[in-house]
């Protein structure tokens, strides 16, 4: 849905483009929002500001038009709120995964060593990857990286939590600390963004991938390129080519 005008956030309904409504998950976020809060929705530039908070809906003003779709991330720009690190849906998913003998888990939006401690206690015999994608994770980086073995930098969400021009610095900082602490860091998001609609990468993308490997990343993650892109196979093939060149000249 192309959003150009005012919208309402509703507590209990899903996207209703005909009545300018959408909802957010988890539902408890609704109660934390207040007047003048600034929200960045997804990665298509949509920005909205809370105008008025009612008991079951929030009226918002669109400050920058953009695309609204299902399952998009929402970032509160102007302040921080404290939510449970696992939702009811997360806990149910973990229960199902354990019953089906799943041994690998990733914790999104890891904010502190306390989050890692709780997750380790919940899943003592599984491999766990902790995602670094918030400003609080950057603030608590040393204590977080002292508590785990495997981490993943999500550059997309981190760029919304901080600013995009800081991402190269944060990436290098995390990878440098990882070498020192002898832990693994994987890097994700926007490696081959141009290949969403083009069979060939740009020189800038090639350099980004190679530099990330040189700096010590233990793995690279393709997301939208293979999930919804038009050239998923070509993306994987190109990534393998660069990794081969890196290993050859390492």
Residue ranges and their predicted role:
Residues 1-250:
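Non-catalytic helical/linker scaffolds that mediate oligomerization, partner binding
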């Amino acid at each position: 849905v192309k959003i150009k005008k005012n919208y309402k956030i509703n507590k209990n309904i899903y996207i209703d483009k005909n009545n300018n409504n959408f909802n957010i998950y988890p539902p408890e976020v609704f109660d934390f929002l207040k007047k003048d809060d600034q929200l960045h929705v997804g990665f298509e530039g949509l920005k909205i500001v809370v105008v008025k908070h009612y008991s079951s809906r929030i009226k918002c003003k669109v400050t920058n038009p953009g695309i609204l779709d299902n399952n998009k991330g929402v970032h509160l720009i102007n302040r921080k709120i404290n939510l449970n690190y696992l939702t009811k849906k997360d806990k149910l998913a973990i229960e199902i995964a354990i019953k089906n003998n799943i041994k690998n888990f990733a914790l999104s939006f890891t904010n502190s060593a306390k989050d890692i401690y709780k997750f380790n206690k919940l899943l003592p015999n599984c491999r766990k990857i902790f995602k670094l994608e918030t400003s609080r994770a950057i603030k608590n980086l040393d204590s977080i990286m002292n508590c785990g073995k495997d981490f993943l930098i999500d550059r997309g969400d981190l760029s919304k939590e901080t600013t995009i021009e800081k991402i190269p610095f944060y990436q290098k900082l995390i990878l440098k600390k990882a070498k020192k602490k002898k832990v693994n860091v994987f890097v994700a998001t926007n490696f081959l963004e141009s290949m969403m609609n083009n069979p060939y990468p740009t020189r800038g993308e090639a350099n980004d991938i190679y530099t990330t490997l040189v700096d010590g990343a233990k793995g690279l993650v393709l997301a939208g390129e293979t999930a919804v892109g038009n050239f998923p196979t070509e993306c994987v093939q190109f990534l393998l080519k660069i990794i081969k060149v890196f290993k050859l000249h390492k």
